[in-house]
Amino acid sequence: MLDKQVTITTGTLITLIRRRGGEPHTILSETPTWYDEGAQRAEDERTNEELASQGLFGPRGLHPGFKATLEAISRPALEYYGWVDGGFEGKALSFTVLAGSAGGEGFVLARHSEHDGVALASVRPEELLTEFLDQIPKLAPGRGRPVAVPKSQVETSRSSSTAQDEGFEVLRSGRQSAGSQEADELRRILSLRRLGSGSLYVAARGRSGARQRIERPVNYIDTTEGRWLTEEIPGSGEPRIAFTPADQQVLGERLRSAQGRLFAS
C-alpha cells in the first residue's frame, strides 16, 4: 500500500503492468504499443530512472507498498472506470479515472487526457466506489423531475463513447400525444448549455478469472441547471429514453445495481 499519492508517466505505468504479464487498461492505452528488444531495454531503463527519482525503486527493487499496488492495477478483481469531461477551477478538463482492488489492495488513478501523467493513490478496498465517485466533479442534481420519452421520439447519433457526444434529439410532431409534455421538457434540457459529461463502467472477475464488464455505461450530462443521468430503459414494449436528476449518490446506486447483474446469467 502506498503511503502517499504519486504521479508517474503513462508509459512507465504501462511498462510496469506488462512486466507483470498484465495488459494495460483501456483508459491508459487504447492502442497497443510494441517495442523491439533495444527499444524495450531503453524503456525499462527510463522507467527505473523515473521510479528511482521518486524513491519507488532502489537496489532492492520496487518499493514494497508500490509493488503491492501495482499487482492490483495489473489484474484487478473489481474495477470502476470512466471517461469524464468537466471542469476544475474554471478550466475545461477531460480525464479518465480507474479505481480497482485485488488481494486486499485498493487503488484509484486518474489520467489527464492531454498530459502524459497518471496520479495514483492507495485506498481501502471497501471504500472503492466512494473514492471513484469522489474523482468526478460534483454538481447539483438537475432542476426538475425525471422525464422519459419513447425511443421512437428520439434520434440518437453516437459518434463516441461519451455521453456528451450521444446527440439525443427529440423529433417534433404536429400531433399532440400523452407524452408531449415530457418530450418538450427533454428537449428543453438538451437545449441547455453543456458543462460536461461522463460515461462510467464497472467490471469484475468471476471465479474462473474471466473478466466481465457491464454492457452499457452509466451516462450523465452536466448542464447549467445541474446533472442529469441519461439512460435507455427497456420494457415489454418500446424502450424509453429517460433523464433523471442525478448526484453522486444516484450515480453510485446505478453502478451498484449494474455490478449486481454481472455474472447473473
What are these regions (language model features)?
Residues 2-265:
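Short, surface-exposed polybasic-aromatic patches that bind anionic ligands, especially phosphate groups
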